[in-house]
């Protein structure tokens, strides 16, 4: 008979299988999770590769288009260069003939006086005459003498330079008086800054050198002129050390240098770092954003704007932002508000100056007004009224203007009456006793502040003379002095005499008895003349 299996043995043999099943199930779960992660990772990589591939394809396509357009442009420039040169030569011949005719007329009629110009036509005629003669020194003197006619000069100089035989040569010779190195004397150099004239003349030269076929994309500058312009630029850069470095260069000089580079097309990529420092140091100039782009700093504009913001020049940063179209990266309204906050902090520091409170208040008002006007002008220029309503700023500006006007009004000061040193009553005019018609007072005379000399005292045996009260002597002063002792009687102490100039010659009212004063003997003479 077969024995039945032991249940305990069955249980022992089944336990390893159950644990193994759990282990395999856990392993399958881990494999599923890993597969899912790997699938997502490779899918993401595939998508990124596809995006990058598409971006590269677009870049290659863009470069191909740019290359093709550049090749076509070069072909067009090559084809048109001969025609442009022919046109330029024809213009030069016409200018030469016009210059010769002008010189002949000048010899026949005498030199015209270009010093006095009444209107725009006269200004243009004078400029044309100087350009035809290639009179660089006269041209320079004519321009610098008319700074008040700056707008007319901007519009008329390019027209006049068209008639010049060699406009670049005339311009370089004209500005050579102060650029690249100022050749004037010390006194004139300090008093007059002619950087504005250099900039106007250099700007006016650009439309004259524009290619008649290609337009502004190509300037007709001869190799000799370009080499001369490069030498001038190198001379200016070499003079920076003598001026104390970039930080000490004047803004008009920086503006002239950058405009010189743009006008003659002599920008160097190796000097971009120098150009950036110069632009940031003179960023408040209105033309600086355009010049920065023209000298090849367009790619560095975001970093330059960040630098301006860090330096506290938010207003300049706004101008740069709009010039290069980076408004989406640097919103203008927060920058303008930050500029106003910084201005308010600066005024608070000035207010803390307790040494000169009046001057501090004036500086605070002026600085705040300047900041408000600059922000209002920026809002108007870039049409930011919806984002930054200017009403509150205008109200604040009007309030400051009103306060400034009220402070300028003269204060009403009451007239002070002249009084004696030892008496609170009114004092008669200083010249009352010196004129023929003596002043007649309706008040009793104040008491004197001095004692009669001891030599006139009765205790030394000299009796006090008596006299009747004075009579009216019409318009004349009494011919003699009288003693007030006759009116008031004798005193127990030394009597007091009254000054002649302030006696009651024409007053019937007797003066009250004055108190006795005993000043120091050395003060006798000083006090006696105190009223005169």
From Swiss-Prot:
<comment type="similarity">
    <text>Belongs to the Frigida family.</text>
</comment>
<dbReference type="GO" id="GO:0030154">
    <property type="term" value="P:cell differentiation"/>
</dbReference>
<keyword id="KW-0217">Developmental protein</keyword>
<protein>
    <recommendedName>
        <fullName>FRIGIDA-like protein 4b</fullName>
    </recommendedName>
</protein>
<keyword id="KW-0287">Flowering</keyword>
<dbReference type="Pfam" id="PF07899">
    <property type="entry name" value="Frigida"/>
</dbReference>
<dbReference type="InterPro" id="IPR012474">
    <property type="entry name" value="Frigida"/>
</dbReference>
<keyword id="KW-0221">Differentiation</keyword>
<dbReference type="GO" id="GO:0009908">
    <property type="term" value="P:flower development"/>
</dbReference>
């Amino acid at each position: 008979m077969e024995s039945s299996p032991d249940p305990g043995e069955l249980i022992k043999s089944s336990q390893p299988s159950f644990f193994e099943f759990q282990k395999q199930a856990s392993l399958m779960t881990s494999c599923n999770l890993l597969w899912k992660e790997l699938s997502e990772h490779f899918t993401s990589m595939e998508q990124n590769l596809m995006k990058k591939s598409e971006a590269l394809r677009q870049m290659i396509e863009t470069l191909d288009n740019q290359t093709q357009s550049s090749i076509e442009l070069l072909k067009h420039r090559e084809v048109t260069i001969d025609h442009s040169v022919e046109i330029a030569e024809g213009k030069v011949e016409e200018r030469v003939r016009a210059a010769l005719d002008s010189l002949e007329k000048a010899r026949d009629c005498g030199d015209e006086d270009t010093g006095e110009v009444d209107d725009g036509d006269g200004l243009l005629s004078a400029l044309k005459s100087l350009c035809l003669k290639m009179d660089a020194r006269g041209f320079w003197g004519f321009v610098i003498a008319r700074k008040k006619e700056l707008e007319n000069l901007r519009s008329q100089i390019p027209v006049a330079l068209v008639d010049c035989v060699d406009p670049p040569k005339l311009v370089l010779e004209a500005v050579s008086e102060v650029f690249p190195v100022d050749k004037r004397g010390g006194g004139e150099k300090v008093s007059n800054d002619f950087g504005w004239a250099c900039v106007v003349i250099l700007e006016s030269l650009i439309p004259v050198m524009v290619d008649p076929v290609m337009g502004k994309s190509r300037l007709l500058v001869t190799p000799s002129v370009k080499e001369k312009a490069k030498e001038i630029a190198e001379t200016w850069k070499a003079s920076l050390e003598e001026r104390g470095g970039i930080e000490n260069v004047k803004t008009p000089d920086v503006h002239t240098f950058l405009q010189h580079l743009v006008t003659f097309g002599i920008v160097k990529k190796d000097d971009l770092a120098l150009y950036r420092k110069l632009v940031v140091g003179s960023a408040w100039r209105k033309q600086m954003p355009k010049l920065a782009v023209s000298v090849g700093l367009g790619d560095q504009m975001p970093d330059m704007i960040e630098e301006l913001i860090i330096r506290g020049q938010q207003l300049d940063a706004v101008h740069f932002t709009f010039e290069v179209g980076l408004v989406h990266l640097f919103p203008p309204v927060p920058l303008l508000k930050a500029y106003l906050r910084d201005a308010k902090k600066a005024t608070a520091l000035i207010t803390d100056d307790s040494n000169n409170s009046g001057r501090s208040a004036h500086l605070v008002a002026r600085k705040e007004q300047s900041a408000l006007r600059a922000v209002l002008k920026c809002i108007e220029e870039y049409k930011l009224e919806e984002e930054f309503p200017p009403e509150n700023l205008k109200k604040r500006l009007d309030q400051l203007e009103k306060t400034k006007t009220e402070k300028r009004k003269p204060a009403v000061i009451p007239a002070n009456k002249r009084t004696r040193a030892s008496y609170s009553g009114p004092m008669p005019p200083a010249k009352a006793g010196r004129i023929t018609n003596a002043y007649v007072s309706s008040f009793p005379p104040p008491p004197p502040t001095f004692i009669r000399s001891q030599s006139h005292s009765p205790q030394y045996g000299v009796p006090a003379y008596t006299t009747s009260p004075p009579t009216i002597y019409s318009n004349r002063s009494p011919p003699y002095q009288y003693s007030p002792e006759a009116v008031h009687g004798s005193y127990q102490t030394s009597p007091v005499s009254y000054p002649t100039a302030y006696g009651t010659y024409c007053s019937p009212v007797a003066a009250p008895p004055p108190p006795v004063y005993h000043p120091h003997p050395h003060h006798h003479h000083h006090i006696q003349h105190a009223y005169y």
